[in-house]
């Protein structure tokens, strides 16, 4: 089971001015229509005032548009995981408590992934020992979904190697498809997660993941074409002429 396809993976940074150096993933799920529109707003700000190589948001912005959204601790490229890798344990607690203040226990969850990686096992263990047991925040069982079908594995890895100049290591992350519940359970046991943190969190996470899937009732209106409305600067006959001007300028800057 996993829920990442139902929301937005944002790039979070505590200080937007340092986002280029501190980008990390943060999963946001639209529980309600208001939450969906708040994700739209976050996405807009991330791509305009928060664009530093990639779209980013910071905690003040997230706090402003948090209603109707469910958030999680996210994967091994999350803020907390990055802090763990840098041995900044106190910062992990501060960030976790910030998220609890913004979302509360009802809308903030601990993600456990079953990847057969040492870094994943360490992260899962810290999440349970330091945060699940102390704060009583429920777990989720999640998979990084990079492609839909398992048969897409080889193509995905080929593209990943191209993007990383051949430095991509496939070990431990060979099943990044949209996995079934049975596959997720098998991945958990294959990675030996139960020996480290206990299988009770696997079954708790499965039930929480199903609960979130039922709670997320936001609906996308795919039948209506909604064109953005914006003011056209003077000197242009209309929006089409202005858009063509922007496209031409953008193309010339890339050539």
Describe the function of each predicted region.
Residues 1-255:
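Phosphodiester-processing cores and adjacent nucleic acid-binding clamps
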């Amino acid at each position: 089971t996993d829920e990442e396809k139902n929301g937005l993976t944002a790039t979070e940074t505590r200080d937007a001015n340092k986002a280029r150096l501190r980008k990390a993933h943060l999963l946001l799920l639209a529980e309600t229509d208001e939450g969906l529109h708040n994700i739209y707003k976050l996405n807009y700000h991330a791509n305009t005032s928060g664009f530093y190589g990639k779209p980013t948001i910071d905690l003040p912005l997230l706090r402003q548009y948090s209603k109707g959204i469910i958030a999680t601790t996210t994967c091994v490229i999350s803020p907390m995981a990055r802090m763990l890798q840098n041995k900044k344990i106190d910062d992990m607690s501060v960030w976790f408590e910030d998220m609890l203040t913004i979302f509360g226990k009802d809308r903030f969850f601990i993600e456990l992934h079953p990847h057969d990686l040492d870094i994943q096992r360490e992260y899962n263990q810290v999440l349970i020992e330091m945060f699940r047991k102390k704060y009583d925040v429920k777990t989720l069982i999640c998979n990084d979904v990079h492609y839909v079908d398992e048969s897409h594995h080889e193509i995905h890895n080929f593209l990943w190697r191209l993007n990383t100049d051949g430095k991509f290591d496939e070990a431990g992350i060979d099943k990044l498809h949209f996995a079934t519940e049975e596959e997720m359970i098998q991945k958990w046991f294959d990675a030996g997660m139960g020996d480290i943190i206990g299988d009770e969190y696997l079954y708790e996470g499965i039930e929480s993941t199903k609960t979130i899937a039922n709670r997320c009732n936001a609906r996308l209106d795919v039948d209506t074409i909604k064109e953005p409305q914006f003011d056209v600067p003077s000197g242009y006959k209309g929006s089409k002429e202005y858009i063509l001007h922007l496209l031409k300028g953008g193309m010339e800057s890339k050539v």
